[in-house]
């Protein structure tokens, strides 16, 4: 199966539309969304609806959790907290209910696992080799057949790899990764809607489960339109400004 794996869309419809156009030309058969479809951006419902129309697999990110329960936003900065309150007000009761029912983890096929921040914890961060080792240990206990897990939350493309008896290694991806026999992987596709790796393009990946191949994609989109919509919605200008910088 060929899958588009997306994370951290953050209500950025122009970015999501550009990514959709890109993966539509790549023979993608399914879409997996790793959470935080909402928050920060100005078009949460349109992004949720677009992914639903694609029959995407959804899991919850911390922004979905905050849209369900504002107490979950206690650790947000002022711009993020204002955006999630605005998002909550804009979404229908039915849509919020659907968000509240999303799982925090999911296995879409044997040997594959999805989570947002850390397994069972959408607010945790996976960004060190030490944390990577803990996640690999957790996944071994959960299901030793898991070969690759996809996660988001950091807004940065990243790969962790582990071979039994060897230390975990973390590295930034190139354009393509071939999954090596015997190795396990934790893979972050980067953010569609608010990259933080210094590259403002929309990031995602394409996973070919039969070939064991991952292609990392960076897609230009109309950043100016996304910024204009954020400002028109009355959200923080900082959320608009950062899009052009990829921070």
Q: Which role fits each region the language model picked out?
A:
Residues 10-15, 39-41, 65-68, 107, ...:
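Active-site environment of divalent metal-dependent phosphoester hydrolases
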Residues 47-145:
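Active-site neighborhood of divalent metal-dependent phosphoester bond hydrolases
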Residues 1-56:
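N-terminal active-site segment of His-dependent metallophosphoesterases
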Residues 23-28, 108-109, 142-145, 181:
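Glycine-rich phosphate-binding loop signature in dinucleotide/nucleotide-binding domains
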Residues 164-247:
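Acidic, His/Gly-rich catalytic cores of divalent-metal-dependent hydrolytic chemistry
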Residues 6-7, 31-36, 57-62, 115, ...:
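Active-site neighborhood of phospho(di)ester-bond hydrolases with catalytic His/Asp-centered motifs
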Residues 133-177, 182-185:
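Anionic-ligand binding region
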Residues 1-4, 107-113, 180-186:
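Beta-strand-turn-beta hairpins that frame and shape the catalytic cleft
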């Amino acid at each position: 199966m060929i899958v588009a794996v997306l994370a951290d869309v953050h209500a950025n419809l122009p970015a999501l539309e550009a990514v959709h156009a890109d993966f539509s030309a790549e023979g993608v058969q399914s879409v997996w969304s790793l959470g935080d479809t909402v928050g920060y951006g100005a078009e949460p419902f349109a992004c949720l609806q677009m992914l639903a129309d694609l029959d995407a697999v959804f899991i919850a990110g911390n922004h979905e959790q905050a849209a369900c329960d504002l107490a979950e936003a206690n650790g947000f900065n002022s711009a993020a907290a204002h955006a999630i309150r605005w998002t909550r007000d804009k979404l229908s009761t039915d849509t919020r209910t659907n968000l509240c029912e999303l799982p925090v983890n999911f296995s879409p096929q044997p040997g594959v696992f999805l989570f947002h921040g850390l397994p069972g914890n959408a607010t945790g961060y996976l960004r060190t080799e030490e944390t990577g080792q803990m996640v690999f240990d957790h996944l071994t206990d959960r299901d030793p057949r898991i070969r690759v897990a996809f996660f988001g939350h950091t807004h940065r493309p990243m790969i962790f790899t582990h071979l039994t008896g060897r230390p975990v290694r973390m590295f930034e991806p190139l354009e393509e990764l071939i999954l090596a026999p015997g190795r396990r992987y934790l893979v972050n596709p980067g953010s569609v809607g608010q990259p933080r790796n210094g590259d403002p393009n929309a990031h995602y990946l394409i996973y070919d489960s039969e070939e064991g191949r991952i292609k990392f994609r960076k897609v230009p989109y109309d950043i100016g339109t996304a910024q204009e919509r954020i400002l028109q919605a009355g959200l923080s200008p900082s959320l608009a400004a950062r899009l052009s910088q990829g921070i």
